[in-house]
Amino acid sequence: MNHLGNVKYLVIVFLIFFDLFLVNGRDVQNNIVDEIKYSEEVCNDQVDLYLLMDCSGSIRRHNWVNHAVPLAMKLIQQLNLNDNAIHLYVNVFSNNAKEIIRLHSDASKNKEKALIIIRSLLSTNLPYGRTNLTDALLQVRKHLNDRINRENANQLVVILTDGIPDSIQDSLKESRKLSDRGVKIAVFGIGQGINVAFNRFLVGCHPSDGKCNLYADSAWENVKNVIGPFMKAVCVEVEKTASCGVWDEWSPCSVTCGKGTRSRKREILHEGCTSEIQEQCEEERCPPKWEPLDVPDEPEDDQPRPRGDNSSVQKPEENIIDNNPQEPSPNPEEGKDENPNGFDLDENPENPPNPDIPEQKPNIPEDSEKEVPSDVPKNPEDDREENFDIPKKPENKHDNQNNLPNDKSDRNIPYSPLPPKVLDNERKQSDPQSQDNNGNRHVPNSEDRETRPHGRNNENRSYNRKYNDTPKHPEREEHEKPDNNKKKGESDNKYKIAGGIAGGLALLACAGLAYKFVVPGAATPYAGEPAPFDETLGEEDKDLDEPEQFRLPEENEWN
């Protein structure tokens, strides 16, 4: 309990809780691996290798011929020299550095040519002079300054020496400059007079370090057995960084509304790379769940409403013409003796038996000429003019007199689609007095039932009566072809408009030409440059003074 009062104790407990429950529960994306660091043998990759051979007098001719040159040849045999791998540079140094194989030359990329040049050192170069390692390292730095080396290639320097350089400080300075520019330096010591501490320090190994992969030494007799493991250790030492690849597009969210997850993947290029990641996604807010509403039950009526003739009758819509009327069903109980045809002669029944059947006027047969309906108008022409909403359709010309209606009551039965025109012969039956008074009136026949345009005279009627060989099928009159007449009128109007425009343009052209020759000022645009004022005057008027030039003529000068 005393620990609870200690602030430091509480802080430590909070940090432990934060590390266990919060830090370990971080998002998965924080553990994504996008880059991999790995080690690879440099000898199989792009490398610019600089081989520096000590040719000082301390090596002696015997060791040069039997050990030093064969050591260099064995080292080159282990290298992969080609355009896309290792490029070789070789120089020998004694008093000064001498270039043997130039970097990026043919021998630098061809192992056979490089071995021929190294084998020639047995006869062309003999050990002599001092150990000028500083000049040899300076030649390597010049390649970097002149950008002779490849930018994407690893830079490796391998030194074969048997002793201590002339200037230790200068050699260390040059080695530090190369190391700062990313160049690795490896030293292979040969013989009994080598300085192990200096060589380890030259390659960057601290004296307290145990094993140094960039340094190895051997006696002259065992040099061929040591160079192989040494070069393998040097090649493995190079560390590289590789990218794990590009991610694919995100997948759609796992839900259509609310919170869900989405993921994306990529191809694994190296071991240890992350291949798939997930993250949360949120879509639009989900709508509320549908729930059925509680609908109260309606109580049924104890006494249902009666249906039948006493139910409410729906009134028919006005101004609607039935092109196919149905004949009213006859009532066998009423009017058996008065109406043998079965039609209801009651004009205004108080209670119609069937409200769905439209009101029909009685149809009087032909033999009942004495019975005249009470609703026959005195002037049938006025009645015909009121029925203007009924569309007109011509009837066949071959209708005979027997097919014509004999009763005015049939007029109200709609024909499909044009009712027959009231003729004078029907007026004769309905109103005999009017026929007697108008004795000069023309009595039409069945031929006059055809529809005619306005303005037709009686000559055409007589022609139709004279020649009865009319075609059986009715022919449409010119006024019954509105589409053809309309097209013909439109084409005639187009020609008229085009002719008017052409005539107007011709008149304008003639008026312009006339105006050009009649009015002098109209020809001004077609004239050349205006002549000077003196040139327009005559010879006798050029010497006149300005007041005399503009003086009005005297009375005697007008003639």
Curated annotation (Swiss-Prot):
Compositionally skewed regions (Polar residues) per UniProt: 431-440
Membrane association type: Single-pass membrane protein
Alphabetized Pfam families for the sequence: TSP_1 (PF00090), VWA (PF00092)
Membrane-crossing segments per the record: 497-515
Main location: membrane
First and last residue of the signal peptide: 1-25
Motif (Cell attachment site): 307-309
Entries under Gene3D superfamilies matching the protein: Thrombospondin type-1 (TSP1) repeat, von Willebrand factor, type A domain
CDD domains recorded: vWA_micronemal_protein
Cross-link (Isoglutamyl lysine isopeptide (Gln-Lys) (interchain with K-? in Factor 3(A))): 77-78
Compositionally biased spans, kind Basic and acidic residues: 283-292, 370-400, 444-459, 466-495, 548-559
Domain named VWFA: residues: 48-234
Compartment list: Cell membrane
Glycosylated residues (UniProt): 132, 310, 460
Region (Disordered), start-end ranges: 280-496, 523-559
Compositionally biased residues, Acidic residues: 536-547
Domain TSP type-1: start-end pairs: 241-287
Side Extracellular, residues: 26-496
GO terms, molecular function: heparin binding
Top-level lineage group: Eukaryota
Protein name listed in UniProt: Thrombospondin-related anonymous protein
Intrachain S-S bonds: 244-273, 253-281, 257-286
Keywords, alphabetical: Cell adhesion, Cell membrane, Disulfide bond, Glycoprotein, Heparin-binding, Isopeptide bond, Malaria, Membrane, Signal, Transmembrane, Transmembrane helix
